[in-house]
Amino acid sequence: MNRFDDAGKLLLRLTIGILLLMHGLFKLANGIESITALVQAQGWPAWIAFGVFIGEIIAPSLLIIGVLTRAGALVIVFNMGLAVYLAHSSQILTLTKTGGWALELQGLFLMGALVVALLGAGRFSLGGSHGRMN
């Protein structure tokens, strides 16, 4: 294994975790009415919207500290997939004015979390590289 692998895992975990946590903290401070409306438009109960806090506060926090990292990453993958389905499905094949994919942020969060789920936390984590909670 390359001596920089664990540093790369840490950097990826911190990047995905911190950036997504910022979105969750914004929703915590400003409310989730728009998400509740999206959920109810699907005919689902409004309480499902509170799951955003699991996907954007709890799971990113797990990535940041490196405990239950793979589970937290899979929660983020599910959360982002649901966000694309509920709020962005009409943009899946859309490009921006500058030629980028309209869902590049969601795609980066989803795929970055999937990579974390596959690789684990690494040794720079509370769970340790071979810990049961990695």
Functional labels for PLM-detected ranges:
Residues M1-A29, A46-I54, I58-N134:
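Extended, low-polarity transmembrane helix blocks
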Residues A29-A46:
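Membrane-interface interhelical connector segments
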